[in-house]
Amino acid sequence: MKPVYIIQRRKSKQVFVGDVAIGGDAPISVQSMTNTETTDVKATVAQIQAIQNAGADLVRVSVPTIDAAEAFKIIKKQVNIPLISDIHFDYKIALKVAEYGADCLRINPGNIGREDRIREVVAAAIDHNIPIRIGVNAGSLEKDLQKKYTEPTPEAMVESAFRQIDILDKLNFDNFKISLKASEIFMTVFAYQQLASQIDNPLHLGITEAGSLRFGTIKSSIGLGLLLSEGIGDTIRISLASDPVDEVRVGFDILKSLNLRSKGVNLIACPSCSRQKFDVIKIVNELESRLEGITAPIDVAVIGCVVNGPGEAKAVSVGLIGGEPNLLYLDGKTHSKITNENLVNELEAQVRNRLKSP
């Protein structure tokens, strides 16, 4: 089925985090962040690998101390995905991790300090040919901006970003991306809209401290959905109080829903009602669990009755319609009858077979 609407993305410059392009005509990348103690090398490496296996393009690692920087050096050698170092307060840590192989340096304008410190961070980024992310957060704005605006506002966040941009411009450094994050949806959206109209550097999107898996997913989907639908955004991170792997899955689901990036199974399912001829909810949950590891794009429909079933099944690669009997559709055409006892096994087999077909 052809999309009704194709989002026209904002034109932006391109930077590279490791071998991952961000901005320009590159796909919108999905990233997450470790929540282990960085000094626990084994646990951090394991979590990075889990995030990577979930499909993430990039991983951010907090580096709060020199000891964590030393651990980062070891971690970097044990993984094969670009790592972004998250730096707050101590600019000297940024200098260390740049030397140790960081693929990008995230600095917070609210706490990184004076211009001379930023100059040193930029010099390190130039020496090692890595980008910087200017990561503005509503909760940690510069003290004078807090006093000027009395509370976080989109305008305060944009002003914070431009202070850093002006410094980087003076240094002829253009290898950077920017984020403007708040936990309030419209503050975040308005800040990004203002900034996006004034610069062409790539933008990292996120609703910070969005909350639990359920509510954080809802907030992030609304906030990022508004921006992405306007073509704003080049890389995303879904901030959830949950397993980082969940962040990756939600991120790709948002992009998939907007037809911005296809990855994994797009599972279409009815909410079920008394007309259903099999337990739709049970079948969908089990099928989704079994197909979770698939990264190749494929559309699958599970519809419990014949009201909308035929129309949905004709538009996907694998479709199931509840009836007497149930019908299996492949590539929009009726393929076979299928009993309730074997629904999940048959659907899983057909999905995997379709992905193997040339």
From Swiss-Prot:
Pfam families (alphabetical): GcpE
EC class: oxidoreductase
GO function term, MF aspect, one: 4-hydroxy-3-methylbut-2-en-1-yl diphosphate synthase activity (ferredoxin)
Catalytic function, reaction form: (2E)-4-hydroxy-3-methylbut-2-enyl diphosphate + oxidized [flavodoxin] + H2O + 2 H(+) = 2-C-methyl-D-erythritol 2,4-cyclic diphosphate + reduced [flavodoxin]
Keywords: 4Fe-4S, Iron, Iron-sulfur, Isoprene biosynthesis, Metal-binding, Oxidoreductase
Manner of cofactor binding, per the entry note: Binds 1 [4Fe-4S] cluster.
Binding site for [4Fe-4S] cluster: 270, 273, 305, 312
Entry's transmembrane regions: none
The EC number(s) this enzyme carries: 1.17.7.3
Cofactors: [4Fe-4S] cluster
Pathway given in the UniProt record: Isoprenoid biosynthesis; isopentenyl diphosphate biosynthesis via DXP pathway; isopentenyl diphosphate from 1-deoxy-D-xylulose 5-phosphate: step 5/6
Gene Ontology biological process: isopentenyl diphosphate biosynthetic process, methylerythritol 4-phosphate pathway; terpenoid biosynthetic process
Protein's job: Converts 2C-methyl-D-erythritol 2,4-cyclodiphosphate (ME-2,4cPP) into 1-hydroxy-2-methyl-2-(E)-butenyl 4-diphosphate.
Similarity comment text for this entry: Belongs to the IspG family.
Name of the protein: 4-hydroxy-3-methylbut-2-en-1-yl diphosphate synthase (flavodoxin)
Organism (species): Ruthia magnifica subsp. Calyptogena magnifica
Organism taxonomic ancestry: Bacteria, Pseudomonadati, Pseudomonadota, Gammaproteobacteria, Candidatus Pseudothioglobaceae
